[in-house]
């Protein structure tokens, strides 16, 4: 960490000298003209999924890839890193949990939660090489700010043979690098939830052949759902240093992030019409409400006999981490050589509320408690009082929610080397290797149920029965049911080979293969159950699960082969068709070792299989002055994926596969000057296979149809005292189709739609004002049912997670 601080300090000092430079240098304009934007789209080069570091023109790639510039990212007003994926066809991101902890589904791949089929990269290297662990998914390790030039999101394609070998989506963020023309900006943002944010970026030339940047953000907000404390509170700094070489360059970069983010799960709602109709729960605004409150914020975990832990909900699903890396590319004697390496270390903890049973009246809760604990001493009734004092009305709706603590310390080192050469005319061969070493130290406490009012910013409730049984004390009415403490480590090595054959000026074919081996190990504390206070009448902590000082060691080795074959035929200079087939794999993870429990179970490849995916796609690409189109059809076949569902009191596991097909599209028309209308989205149909219990059911959480329609219009306003001024107006209509919240297809999630709007005023070359609003009409849409309950949840009071209500932001940017 000291090395990273030294690097950032060095870069910062160097770049800050740019501020004092006295020479007059041209400033970049705030936004490109429509003609410039079209030219940039046609000529845009992508580096994700390409064999050589210098990349390939997007329209000439034989795979499906979505790109977004800095301006396109700002127009999208993403609420989190995962929310950026709403721009990507074939991907559905449930980003309603806040900054972290998203569920992301890709192309009908069967995933129950988190984001196992999305890898997040920075400058082409994975931030953490394992895309998902329990209570960690890749987007949680990244925060967007003004140091990012663009993002590229590759779906399928040749990604199965490069980098981590991700068969799903690869999300690659490209950092800005210093250029001859300096860029110096400061941006102030305010908005809903008392948002206060400042972004700063400085970049430019330091000396002959040397370039640097430094930037970052600081931000505080109570959020759209105000928990009565800061929902997001953090800061980040990023620096780069680039050295130009003969025929190439090397860039080193470092990023430090310290961010606390509240994590949102379900809220009380009313379901009717077999789950087709969702309405507000009495007294609870589903768009802005949360059960979290100052009363719940600081809580205690009865972890083991004689052991209690103090936790703070304000810590949420945040991150305190750093990444340092190097990106080298150079042409040496006819050989193209590139190497990307990074080291990541950080704490990505989850101190959060997870909703449990659906709301009931206080009287119904008390009756159930009497029935459950009657054998202890013939309980006949009892009392329910608020922790802060006062009796609870028997008709008061109450709900249970677990206050969980999951601490994860992650470390990793990754490196990828590629060497390319045209070995014979029109044949370019690429050979390379990939290495990753990674660790995770975990300490979990799941359960810890609390009884509270089903109201915004809930109040805690105590329950005591007439026989002396204490059902809930300080709101705690449930024990810790899972407490794994474990140290994990693993490493992957891979070799890959790719060949590109230019058959003619119109036809190009490529093929590649990858051989990869993974070794993972775990040392997991054995668990026992007991009464933490030796008092049978304090039933809330009876049967508490806790770790012992004895450990079980588990390990597994796996080797897989992956392939890709594709081709592209140019119909014209800026139009082409392509085909692609690939076979890829995802390895089992640390969690699979823990869930298996014994070495014999780990060794059972039927019970703990190595997932395999086969994909086929065919597509068409074109771009021009008046229109652009990127359209592809795909087919996927998935086998052998293990599922885990953490309920209110247990962990459920199963193994399944799936098949799916669909169409993805990104279309744009520019019928007149300054007007553009884009339409992007996908239609897909995916079903479970291989598991008789759910075979034929729709893959959970994924809409059959989703799309975004975005018109934008630029209005030149002429010269003003500040210089050339224009106004851009834009908006987005989003449709998300119906889905099932569970594998059994019993919990229905209705379709929903949202409207977003925005305006950007460019005032000369120095000033920029932007105003945006998301979910303008306060649509009530669900992204998740109660994932900690099984079975039908179709009528009456339920817990589910809606999208955020209307949020408005305004920002002022100054270039200096």
Pin down the residues of each PLM region.
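Extracytoplasmic beta-strand/coil segments of soluble accessory domains associated
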Residues: 32-34, 50, 82-126
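N-terminal periplasmic accessory domains that precede
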Residues: 81-84, 103-105, 121, 138-141, ...
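Short acidic/polar hinge/loop motifs at secondary-structure boundaries
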Residues: 126-155
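Transmembrane beta-barrel wall of Gram-negative outer-membrane proteins
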Residues: 183-185, 190-294, 316-331, 514
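Acidic/polar loop-and-plug regions of large Gram-negative outer-membrane beta-barrel proteins
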Residues: 242-244, 249-323, 351-405, 458-488, ...
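Membrane-embedded beta-barrel scaffold of Gram-negative outer-membrane proteins
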Residues: 336-342, 570, 576-586, 607-663, ...
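C-terminal beta-signal and adjacent terminal beta-strands/loops
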Residues: 734-742, 759-816
């Amino acid at each position: 960490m000291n090395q990273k601080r030294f690097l950032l300090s060095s870069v910062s000092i160097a770049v800050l000298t740019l501020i004092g430079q006295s020479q007059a240098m041209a400033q970049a304009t705030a936004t490109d003209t429509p003609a410039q934007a079209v030219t940039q789209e046609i000529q845009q080069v992508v580096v994700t999924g390409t064999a050589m570091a210098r990349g390939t023109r997007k329209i000439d790639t034989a795979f499906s890839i979505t790109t977004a510039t800095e301006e396109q990212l700002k127009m999208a007003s993403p609420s989190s890193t995962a929310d950026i994926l709403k721009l990507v066809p074939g991907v559905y991101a449930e980003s309603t949990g806040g900054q972290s902890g998203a569920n992301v589904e890709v192309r009908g791949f069967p995933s129950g939660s988190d984001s196992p089929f999305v890898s997040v990269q920075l400058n082409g290297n994975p931030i953490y090489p394992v895309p998902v662990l329990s209570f960690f998914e890749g987007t949680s390790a990244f925060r967007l700010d003004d140091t990012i030039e663009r993002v590229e999101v590759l779906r399928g394609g040749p990604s199965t043979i490069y980098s981590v070998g991700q068969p799903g989506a690869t999300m690659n963020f490209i950092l800005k690098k210093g250029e001859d023309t300096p860029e110096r900006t400061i941006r102030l943002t305010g908005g809903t939830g008392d948002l206060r944010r400042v972004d700063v970026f400085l970049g430019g030339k330091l000396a002959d052949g040397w370039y640097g940047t430094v930037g970052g953000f600081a931000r505080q907000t109570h959020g759209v759902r105000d928990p009565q404390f800061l929902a997001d509170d953090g800061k980040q700094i990023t620096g780069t240093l680039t050295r130009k070489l003969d025929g190439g360059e090397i860039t080193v970069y470092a990023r430090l992030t310290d961010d606390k983010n509240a994590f949102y799960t379900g809220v009380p709602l009313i379901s009717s019409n077999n789950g087709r109709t969702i309405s507000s729960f009495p007294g609870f605004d589903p768009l802005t409400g949360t059960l979290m409150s100052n009363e719940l914020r600081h809580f205690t975990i009865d972890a083991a006999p004689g052991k209690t832990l103090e936790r703070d909900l304000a810590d949420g699903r945040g991150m305190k981490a750093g990444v340092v890396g190097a990106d080298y590319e150079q042409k040496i004697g006819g050989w193209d050589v590139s190497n990307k390496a990074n080291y990541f270390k950080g704490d990505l903890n989850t101190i959060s509320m997870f909703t449990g049973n659906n709301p009931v009246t206080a009287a119904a809760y008390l009756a159930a408690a009497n029935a459950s604990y009657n054998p202890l001493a013939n309980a006949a009734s009892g009392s329910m009082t608020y922790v802060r004092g006062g009796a609870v009305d028997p008709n008061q709706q109450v709900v249970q929610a677990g206050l969980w603590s999951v601490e994860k310390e992650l470390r990793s080192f990754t490196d990828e080397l590629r060497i390319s050469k045209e070995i014979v005319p029109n044949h370019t061969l690429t050979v390379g290797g990939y290495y990753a070493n990674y660790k995770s130290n975990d300490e979990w406490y799941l359960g810890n149920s609390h009884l509270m009012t089903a109201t915004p910013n809930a109040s805690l409730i105590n329950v005591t029965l007439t026989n002396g049984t204490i059902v809930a004390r300080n709101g705690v009415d449930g024990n810790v049911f899972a407490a794994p403490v474990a140290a994990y480590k693993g490493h992957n090595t891979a070799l890959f080979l790719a060949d590109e054959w230019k058959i003619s000026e119109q036809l190009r074919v490529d093929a590649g293969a990858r051989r990869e081996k993974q070794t993972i190990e775990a040392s997991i504390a054995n668990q026992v159950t007991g009464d933490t206070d030796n008092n049978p009448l304090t039933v809330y902590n009876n049967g508490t699960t806790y770790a012992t000082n004895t450990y079980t060691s588990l390990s597994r080795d796996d080797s897989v082969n992956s392939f890709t074959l594709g081709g592209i035929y140019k119909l014209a200079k800026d139009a082409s068709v392509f085909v692609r087939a690939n076979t890829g794999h995802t390895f089992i993870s640390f969690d699979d070792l823990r869930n298996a429990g014994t070495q014999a179970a780990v060794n059972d490849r039927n019970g703990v299989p190595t997932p395999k995916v086969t994909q086929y796609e065919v597509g068409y690409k074109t771009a021009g002055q008046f229109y652009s189109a990127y359209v592809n059809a795909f087919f996927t076949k998935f086998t052998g994926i293990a599922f885990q569902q953490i309920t209110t009191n247990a962990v459920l596991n199963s193994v399944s596969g799936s098949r799916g097909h669909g169409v993805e599209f990104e279309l744009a028309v520019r019928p007149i000057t300054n007007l553009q209308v884009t339409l992007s989205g996908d239609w897909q149909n995916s079903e479970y296979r291989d598991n008789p219990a759910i075979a034929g059911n729709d893959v959970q959480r994924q809409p059959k149809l989703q799309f975004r329609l975005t018109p934008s219009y630029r209005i030149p306003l002429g010269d003003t005292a500040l210089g050339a001024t224009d106004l851009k107006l834009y908006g987005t209509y989003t449709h998300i189709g119906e889905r099932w919240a569970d594998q059994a297809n019993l919990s229905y999630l209705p379709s929903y739609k949202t409207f977003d709007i925005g305006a950007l005023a460019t005032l000369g070359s120095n000033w920029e004002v932007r105003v945006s609003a998301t979910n303008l009409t306060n649509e009530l849409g669900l992204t998740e049912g109660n994932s900690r309950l099984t079975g039908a949840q179709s009528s009456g009071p339920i817990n589910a997670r809606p999208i955020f209500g209307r949020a408005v932001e305004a920002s002022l940017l100054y270039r200096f």
